[in-house]
Amino acid sequence: MLGNITPVSFFKTWVLKKTDVHVMISAREVFPCFIFRVFLLFQVFSRVHTLTNHANFEFEKSLSSCDKPCYNGVCLNKACVCSKGWYGSQCDHCFGRIRISDNASYISDGPLDYSPSAKCTWLIEPENSATPLKIRINSFFTECGWDYLYIYDGDSVYGKQLAALCGEQPSQEFTAASGKALVHFFSDLAINLNGFNVSYESNRCAYNCSNHGSCLNGKCDCEDGYKGLNCEYQVCQLSGKSTESPCHEGQCVDGRCECLSARVHGETCQMPVSSSVWDLIHPTNNAPTGKASHASIAIDDVVWSIGGEFFDGSSDPNNIDVYNVTSRIWSKVEVSGDMPKPRFDHTVVKYKNKLYMFGGVTKTQVRHQTTQAATNELWIFDMGSKKWAQQIHKNETIIAAPFAVAGHSAHVIRSEMFVIFGYNPLFGFMHHVQIYNFETEEWTVANTSDHVYGRFKHSAVEYTTPTGATAILVYGGSMWNNTITDSLMQFDTSTKKWSNLPQSGVQLYLHAAAYLNGLMVVVGGRGSNVTAGSKSECFSNMVQSYDVACKQWSNMSTAPVDLKRFGHSVHVIGQKLYALGGFNGKMKSDVWTLSPAKCSSATRPDECRLITDGTKCVFVDSSCVPFDPTVSYKSSFASMIKSSTPKSFDECTNTPLRLALKTCEEQTDCVSCASKSGCGWCSSGEQCLPNEQECVDGPGMLTSWEKCPQRNSVATMRPCNMENNCGSCRISPHCTWYPIDKASPCVSKEDLSPAFFLVHSRRKGKNRDPNQYQAADMSRVPRAAAFNSLAVVYEYETKSVLADRNKFLSPSHFPSFFRNATECPMPCAQRNNCSDCTDLEQCMWCPSTNRCINLEAYTLSFAYGQCHSWVTSGSGSVINRVCQAESVVCEEHKTCGECQRDPGCGWLADDSKTGLGLCIRGTSTGPLEPKPENSTWYFIDCPACQCNGHSTCFTSVGSFPPVTIEKCQSCQNHTTGAHCERCAPGFYGDARNGGVCSPCDCHHQADMCDPVSGQCFCKTKGVTGDRCDKCEAKYVGNPRNGTPCFYELAVDFIFTFKLRSDDKDNHTSEIYLYSVPYKKDTDVTFQISCESPKGNALVALNMTSSYVNGLADKSQAMMVDTICDSKGFRRVYVASDKGYPFGPDSNTTFFVRVYNFNTPVQIVVSFAQSPPINWVLFFVIFAACFIVLLVVAGLLWMIKVRIEAYRRNQRRIDEIEHMASRPFASTKMELSMLSQFSSAGGPTPLSIEPCSNYRAGVFTLAVRLPTGGKAVTPSGTSGLAVASSLCLLTPQQVGVLQAQDNGESNSGRKSNFRNLLRLTIRQRPNNND
């Protein structure tokens, strides 16, 4: 490492390297010359030693002056100078290619977390490369599914691929039989983790053959009694029981362990029968190449494995591998006739004597490139004739089955094949259940009203329900938005209905499941993606079981670590479960078997219940037996007599969840379910569940009966917000796609307003970009109108989608459908190149597979590291350059550095020493194609300078430190840059590798253009276009002919131009204006100001005019190079001057040019024509107006006074009349002496005021005040008072007081009062009675 050398040794090393050349040359010369050169060499060494001693202190100081350590480099001038293959401020990130020739060493991404977008390649070529190479993974932790370390056996990627490691990997070893290895690391932009540390050692096999064999030609030659790739498994050879036998409690019989006791089982009789046991099966012959995502099926005691994903360099992927579990022999089926394309993520089922293979992702090799595509092909394999035949579909519409799917599951029920879910590149995650009838050869879609989400790479098993129907259990899988689910659902094949079952609590996909002893056993899988703060398992070895009868999940005994994998398959044969293949960073071909626990090992009921590993037991008749769902078990006699009420047998453990589930399942409708405490209604499956659970899909759980739908309501349509793909949204007749709403782009047509049909009719017939959404230009339209517009634009016409399926599948026919019929953007799957793919934001281009996919489908499509890099719309501003740089077509790379970032390419440089060359496929030894003459192959390093054919390399040596400097001399052909890799200012093109730089074609309207695309940076405001050949709106001119674009300034208006430092105005440095004064004999005032933080501007003003009297046109410069600042200036041009003829007859025009400014700038400019003011006339008019104003004001004031007086008098009259209309009367009172007694019998009221209801009234009476025992009241005090009281009225009083008719005079009221008084007097009681 350079970081460990001393300054002196570094200096001496450089001198020795330089002198080696002279020594080799001197060997060919005569002896005297040699002596002379030795003398000079001695003088050089002496001088070097002296310089080193003097400079040692300063050099050491410079090396130690960096703030942070330089891990893979040296510190010079307070900065780290990195060694080859490293970069970063601390030389802590790997970069480019490195060749390692040591017999034993290590490689690493760096001491810290690896960098984003890393591409690092190590070529391990030990000196002893003729012997096998052992590669050991010491530590490894990267982002699961995104950041991979690829290991190849050989000196290039064209050798056999050994691994594609990601996630968290255990310590493991590999053997490169060729003695060489190429290791390539790729990371993306998102998450950066600890990385890896890998060591290697030459002349070793992996694990040293477990010390039970010898390494021969890269393979372990095992000793007797040991097998395996690394001799890691001991097998029995000698018959009978032996101390050296691997059989723990058994003996060897015909090469296998035969257990001597019924209490143990397993491959080596190592486990008691009360527990399940996993065993690795050692096949009798060599296993085939490892693979994953294959399709397999168990027929009798044979497993057929078809297709799958393989590593590069593996055997023929079309092979059909067959494994016999009884004989433990692998074999291949010889197939004749037509062959289907290689594929993975497909399914295979058996009906009668034929195998049916449907769907998956096909792989096509075209010119060293692999193209992948999802398919809906159905192939039939005749097991008798060993021939394939493709079944041609009868449906001719793309919106009918069969849909192309991958990652689905298939099940044979009676004479039909049920295809569950899967991913379709056009419609996303399919929620449909496709049904194929073997007899009629017709495809249909199950008509179900339940609303569920589609899934990818779930697991599914079929079983027979207690009612005799066949149901399919579907567990886990990946859904839209990269969501992994732990849900379990059941599909009834008779009623075509979905129902919800308890979740497992573990999110998995790419797992496998089988039905064993009443249990759904789920093995392995891939968990959630790794994030920066968590360590979720990328490869799982978890084994779960779901009790179908009890509806309970449980975890089985811990499986071996070697079982961590995904993409495998499992089958049940002879009461055992077999797991085959899969991926855990390596493609696996091993076979594991699960031997479930045996019920007979239990003797007590409690022991019987505890046996749950791979089986389900019940204690009946004093014995523990396997549970059979078709048998009705009864309770024992002892348990019956102990209880007052006999109970039926319950084989399940009554957990709180199960009790709640049992209670809720008794409710059959929404109202009763929601009314039950602790229960909720799932409308998607019309099922009642405990509210601790969740509805699998569709709307949320209903826990209030008031929210339940009506009993007689029609089944609801699938909610539009459950569709997350434009294609799936469009095939729903009640939905439409609204891309502006990012949260829920699929909306119901019922929510749209009919107010936008007019808008659509105006748009109809206009040219539209078919690749863009039709709502992209509706930002100014109200939301309701925009909704309806999309309803019209996206109106689905069934006639438009009728097309021959073969034509539809071709790329040339597909765009017309999606552009004209559904108005959806072209799907990612139909974009066939990088630039088209990245035009759509949600698309991602994978160069290594030549495939464009949706962002949400990346981890689904490339679960095994098939994508070595990817490009999206956010990868860079010049997307074409990024696409070119990431291409796997070597010939598209233009420089040596870019070429070597692709591990499959090398640089073939010509011998002109100018940097010209060709990037082609090759290995470290040379190109794969024939090498042309006069060329040199570079696989690790690059030629000096790399001047791209525009210069030659110049070499010089620095004074101190003595570092060789190689640089390009003056670049020619209008190029610039350290390697002449860019076009010089004023030119554009691709200067790399001899490219041509052309002058910017900007019609003299720009000084510079984009050096790559040639897009002109127009310097004149108002000029636009890639070639500055058009004028913007409101500007006039013809830039093509050299005439700039002018903006007209209307007279007597102020104009403000704000030019910002953005992409639009960043290069603007001038603006042209003009104004036409239309008033004759009126002065013209020109005013302008220029405010900019980057300096002042200059102004030029010209005036042109033509005379009506026949004189020639006249043009004169009014000002030139006049400085314009923030204060501005003002000029007045007098109309009386003969040189300024204004008015329509003279056709005078002012032309203004504001130039030499830098943005941002604000320009305020105006032309004004105001006639001179006649002050006498002004004051006369002003005085007249003022007098008129006073007169009018006086008149208005007088009118106001008159009106107010009239209103005041009128109000007074009304008040007097109102007071006069009040009831009043006079009365005479006779005061008797105190000693006298009145014969009248009592007082009479002075007045009576009846209430509104005439039932009571206020009686007012005169009251004599007390005198205090004297004859009269004291002097100054009144002797009388008026008192009032509320009293009831008699009928007679009411009759007198009743209100009279309208029109009765006020005098009548007074007479009524008198009558009342007389009535009161008559009714006074007689005291004599």
Curated annotation (Swiss-Prot):
Record keywords, A-Z: Disulfide bond, EGF-like domain, Glycoprotein, Kelch repeat, Laminin EGF-like domain, Membrane, Repeat, Signal, Transmembrane, Transmembrane helix
Highest taxon, organism lineage: Eukaryota
Residues exposed to the Cytoplasmic side: 1197-1329
Alphabetical list of PROSITE patterns matching this protein: CUB, EGF_1, EGF_2, EGF_3, EGF_LAM_1, EGF_LAM_2
Transmembrane segments annotated in the record for this chain: 1176-1196
Presence of the UniProt keyword Glycosyltransferase in the record: no
Pfam family, one: GBD_ATRN
Keyword Membrane: yes
Subcellular location: Membrane
Domain CUB: 94-203
Domain EGF-like: 65-92, 204-232, 235-270, 952-998
Annotated ranges, domain Laminin EGF-like: 945-999, 1000-1047
Disulfide bridge positions per record: C66-C75, C70-C80, C82-C91, C94-C120, C144-C166, C205-C215, C209-C220, C222-C231, C236-C252, C247-C257, C259-C269, C945-C953, C947-C968, C971-C980, C983-C997, C1000-C1009, C1002-C1016, C1018-C1028, C1031-C1045
CDD domains: CUB, EGF_CA, EGF_Lam
GO CC field: membrane
Residues of this chain annotated as glycosylated in UniProt: 103, 197, 208, 324, 395, 447, 481, 529, 555, 820, 832-833, 934, 973, 1066, 1102, 1147
Membrane topology per record: Single-pass type I membrane protein
GO-annotated biological processes: animal organ morphogenesis; tissue development
Extent of the Kelch repeats: 302-353, 355-408, 416-463, 471-518, 520-575, 577-619
InterPro entries in the record: Beta-prop_ATRN-MKLN-like, CUB_dom, EGF-like_dom, GBD_ATRN, Kelch-typ_b-propeller, LE_dom, LMN_ATRN_NET-like_EGF, LZTR1/Attractin
Name of this chain's protein: Putative protein tag-53
Organism: Caenorhabditis elegans
Classification of source organism: Eukaryota, Metazoa, Ecdysozoa, Nematoda, Chromadorea
Gene name of the encoded protein: tag-53
